[in-house]
Amino acid sequence: NDKIKQIELGDYIDKLDSFKDDSFDAIIDVASLCCNDREKSKNIFTKAVRKLKKGGKFYSSALSKQVFGYEADKGDFFEPNHGIYIKMGSLRFDDEKSLKELYKELKCINFYTQTLKDKQSIKEEILIFEGEKSSTEAMGGGIIKNKALENE
């Protein structure tokens, strides 16, 4: 496509520097930032926001602390020992508050929760943040919509 001018492969923290500030219409994170601890995620996100144009959109999906395999005593970044994320390396888990805090530089347009559960436990829960870069500081807000898909 002639609209894609540049593609980079590698670590966000390094590759974002090769793009001009205020040049992205949108950034879509499909559960890749959650492979970084909170501090590195903040650093990546701060760089990413600089690349968004005013009014640019940011979509991010993250792993919920409600998922089977999350262990609160291990903090929010660890390698799960059970559940669907075993043998995937260390992952960061969030809740609504921590994700909105991470992305506080953006106006929150919507906040969704996508849940997959059986009769015994939540097997998968993804948090989806939809934000927009504005000319002012963080705006907060947002709407929560829950959708449960049950296996019976």
Question: Each predicted region: which residue ranges?
Answer:
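A short acidic, Gly/Pro-enriched loop at the edge of an enzyme's catalytic core
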Residues: D17-I27
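A short, hydrophobic secondary-structure junction motif
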Residues: V30, L52-K53, K97
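A short glycine-rich, Lys/Arg-flanked "PGG" loop and its adjoining helix->strand segment in the class I
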Residues: K42-K54
